[in-house]
């Protein structure tokens, strides 16, 4: 079943939307971003979150101690790393967190070498999932689906053929996913899950951006329909 992660949660209304629609994962951003929250803010928001929804903490080039400081206040189900964290860093982090905490590594679609490396079985002890994103995470920019298929050396014209999950490491797909394009992107590359943020947002009168319940619902319904079929 295709999993859904809604990332960049910042307010109580968005928590309410999550509780109604029940994606498998939600994300708090703890690195510099327009969606960044403090650990105290995230803790307060999470108190009202449905316990079935897993919490992902997004970090970028933080120290291990900084990540552990967050976990000590807000128990995370998943640590998502978006920076230049290498294998040694990830292995050290893995050794210092509870076994129940998964580690995901986000990689740019242009970082072909590392995507292939982390998809290899040798890294399964430290990486539980990889997340393939565009070159500007959180920007809403898409990238050609063929880029993933070229990376994996398979035929992009065959439905469900471009499938990293048949390798040794499952992956989440990010990068400009919206309710309008989610079905096509899932069918073409068969990810384990999708990661969405800007694609389900609206711009408010004051210029801020927040999650739209209708867009969130539309996207999740389309993913669920694919799962049923």
From Swiss-Prot:
CDD domains membership: PRAI
Reactions this protein catalyses: N-(5-phospho-beta-D-ribosyl)anthranilate = 1-(2-carboxyphenylamino)-1-deoxy-D-ribulose 5-phosphate
The UniProt record lists the keyword GTP-binding: no
Biological processes per GO annotation: L-tryptophan biosynthetic process
A GO MF label: phosphoribosylanthranilate isomerase activity
Keyword Protease included in the entry's annotation: no
Class in the EC hierarchy, top level: isomerase
SUPFAM superfamilies: Ribulose-phoshate binding barrel
Signal peptide interval: none
Disulfide bonds: none
Pathway recorded for this protein: Amino-acid biosynthesis; L-tryptophan biosynthesis; L-tryptophan from chorismate: step 3/5
Enzyme Commission number, as recorded: 5.3.1.24
PANTHER family associated with the record: N-(5'-PHOSPHORIBOSYL)ANTHRANILATE ISOMERASE
Family according to the record: Belongs to the TrpF family.
Protein name: N-(5'-phosphoribosyl)anthranilate isomerase
Organism encoding this protein: Clostridium beijerinckii (strain ATCC 51743 / NCIMB 8052)
Gene: trpF
């Amino acid at each position: 079943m295709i999993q859904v992660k809604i990332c960049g949660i910042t307010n109580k209304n968005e928590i309410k939307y999550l509780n109604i629609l029940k994606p498998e994962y939600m994300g708090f951003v703890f690195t510099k971003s327009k969606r960044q929250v403090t650990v105290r803010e995230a803790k307060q928001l999470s108190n009202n979150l449905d316990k079935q929804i897993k919490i992902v903490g997004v970090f970028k080039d933080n120290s291990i101690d900084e990540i552990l400081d967050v976990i000590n206040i807000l128990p995370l189900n998943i640590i998502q790393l978006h920076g230049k964290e290498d294998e040694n860093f990830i292995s050290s982090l893995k050794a210092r967190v509870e076994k129940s905490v998964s580690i995901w590594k986000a990689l740019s679609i242009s970082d072909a070498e590392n995507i292939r490396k982390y998809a290899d079985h040798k890294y399964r002890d430290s990486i539980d999932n990889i997340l393939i994103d565009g070159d500007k995470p959180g920007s809403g920019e898409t990238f050609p689906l063929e880029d993933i298929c070229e990376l994996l050396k398979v035929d992009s014209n065959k439905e469900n053929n471009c499938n990293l999950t048949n390798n040794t490491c499952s992956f989440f797909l990010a990068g400009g996913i919206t309710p309008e394009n989610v079905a096509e992107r899932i069918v073409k590359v068969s990810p384990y899950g999708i990661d969405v943020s800007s694609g389900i947002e609206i711009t408010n009168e004051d210029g801020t951006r927040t999650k739209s319940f209708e867009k969130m619902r539309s996207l999740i319904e389309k993913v669920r329909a694919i799962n049923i079929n």
